[in-house]
Amino acid sequence: MRTAFISLSFLLAGSLMVPAIAHTPASKKKVATTTQKGKILPMKEYIDQLMAKMTLQEKISQLNLMVAGDITTGGALNTQVGGDIAKGNMGGVFNIKGLDKIKALQDIAIKNSRLGIPLLVGMDVIHGYETIFPIPLALSCSWDTEAMKKVGEVSAKEASAAGINWTYSPMVDIALDARWGRISEGNGEDPYLSGVMGAALTQGYQGADMRTEEILRADRIMACLKHFALYGAVESGKEYNTVDMSRIRMMNQYLPPYEAVVKAGVGSVMSSFNLIDYTPATANHWMMTDVLRKQWGFKGFVVTDYASIAEILNHGTAKDLKEASEQALLAGTDMDMCSNAFVKHLAQSVAEGKVTEEDINTACRRILEAKYKLGLFSNPYRYCNAKRNKTDIYSAENRQIARDVAAETFVLLKNEGNLLPLKKQGKIALIGPLADTRDNIAGTWSVAQAPEKYTTIKEAMEKALDGKATLLYAQGSNIWRDRELQKNGEQGKSIAWGDEVKMKNEALQIAKEADVIVCAMGETADMSGECASRTNLEMPDVQQELLAELAKMGKPVVLLNFAGRPTVLSWENEHIPAIMNVWFGGSEVGDALCDVIFGDKVPSGKLTTSMPKTTGQEPLYYNHQNTGRPVPDDNQKFAKFASNCLDVSNGPLYPFGYGLSYTTFEYGDLKLSSHEVNMDDWKITATINVKNTGSRDADEIVQLYIRDMVASISRPVKELKGFQRIHLAAGESREISFDITPEMLKFYNAELKHVIEPGDFQIMVGGNSKEVKIQNLTVK
């Protein structure tokens, strides 16, 4: 969702043009909010009383969500959005920054609308508010559920202090194609890991299960699961493109993370832009009602993505906006983001019998229940706390948490000769267009970022070195040779454009003087993210050419690769001795990077996406099905009449789960408590000894994979089923155990039933998806 990307002026221009709300003398009295004891009524009783006083159009208006636009404090009532709120024509607003602006709108809703129903106030708090954490793809590389929960807590604490009560996160779309820009916003290619991390983030945001009637704390906000569903499976990795897949693949590979977040108690769900079974997701009854509500038991409300009801017309399944609104409502969509479809047309649809007032009541009640659970009926201003607004945003405590989390997300891909960590001595050349940029380090979808407060990589290194070494700096290059391409990837986050030859010569000159060269290169923040698909995943031309010149100098070179997706680093892997994938590490990335590259902390991140050797391998993922003609080794050269390519071997450059450390880990033999288990008497444990064989205390991520050898349908070559992030002191050994549960062996069969089938399985444990210890298990 990004408001600037969709041009629907014919829908959004002018006032809402909805039927006038009847104001009879008897209806002017606002609903009672408390019992005689001063406590708010129970949720059902409260909402029953409120809805009994609402007109049909007022109920429909609760289903309307709009961008608030530019609000000036004191003049909000005179704006278009303020006027519509006063008329009771809006249930929520989103993407406003400024407590005073939000309070002004909430004032109008409470004091000027007939029933005084408070607003939902949403924002894309995707990986932080002003304290920005690493992009979600980077966060997943921490494999740290407690850190993920803390990210949600801090994000909610800051957003709620700024007047926000609803975030459009987590995104758990499985993405197998790195060409798709929004891979940056999810948790990678694995359904189990994505579900676990998404659930942890949701728990952090909300602090409560919104399937219950518990009212959230004032420093927590409602989460929104997105994009439901399959958005990450767009063809060719092209934004907003068609999705076409079998239901059996949906159920086994794509839907599990959404279900995990629903089971974690998420309060709302956002529908996706794409087709599902050739029907727009927003109008897909099977997905929105049969799967989401009936099968998974979701109790919250469904909001569309930006203007996606209007986009039903472009998909060609509705003749006009009125029909599109009917399709969306009847499918199970409750709230319309920015199409103005519901608020304009549903009253007429009720009059014509196309939808019923009970359909409207159902959607309205779901939204009012969310407001109740947010505590807005108890205190509409609980998210407008001026004191918290001054103390809880971008605090020293929050910044330290972000710094610590960022350090866990960096993935060390290569470290030839233990070049890293660097010593604080001699002369260090810092070169690259991303070394001294302030507004790119936070990454895409940093809506509320305050870059003027952030520290660049250059500034952080100067502070970390503290005179112990000399830091030499040169930008070195533009992002692209083509200025138009650079503008496309900036989206307002600019990097100075300079003379290519002059910048290159400056970089080569300081490199000659230096003992070691550190290169900060790669993508800008918005070369990944929404509407940022790429057909070539290699480092942009002019940067790679500079890197090649630096590599020829015979000096030690460290590449800090900035990216919002898996990129192609085949040339770099061959020629650069040390490579660290640093993604976009958020507001504190400068200090966090210095913690790691100078050795105060040890890198522990592991990839949650397979990194390709070439763009032509995409989509690329570890948990694929076998073919009838497999190659025995993913990295073997071409074999005739086998499933492979002429020019590149099948395997990734770096596999899923991979990441190096400043120490080494040794895995002993894998042991099972039994090699046979009966379905009616299930107890099986896998154990393995892991030893830190290096000289540094460090974290390791121990990964459990399972393969179903023979089943009624073809099963993946391996699937992640568990992991443990452990800390081992230098020389320490520990026995790690995994309970193998029946749930780990279940899958959806051809009848879409969730089953365990007896047979043979491989149990695998290791430090990444390629290097594993294996034992066999038979289920009877």
Please provide the spans of the model-predicted regions.
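Glycoside hydrolase catalytic-domain context in secreted enzymes
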Residues: 20-746, 755-769, 775, 780
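Positively charged n-region of N-terminal signal peptides that target proteins for export
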Residues: 1-5
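Bacterial N-terminal signal peptides
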Residues: 7-15
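Short proline/glycine-enriched turn/loop segments at secondary-structure junctions
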Residues: 751-753
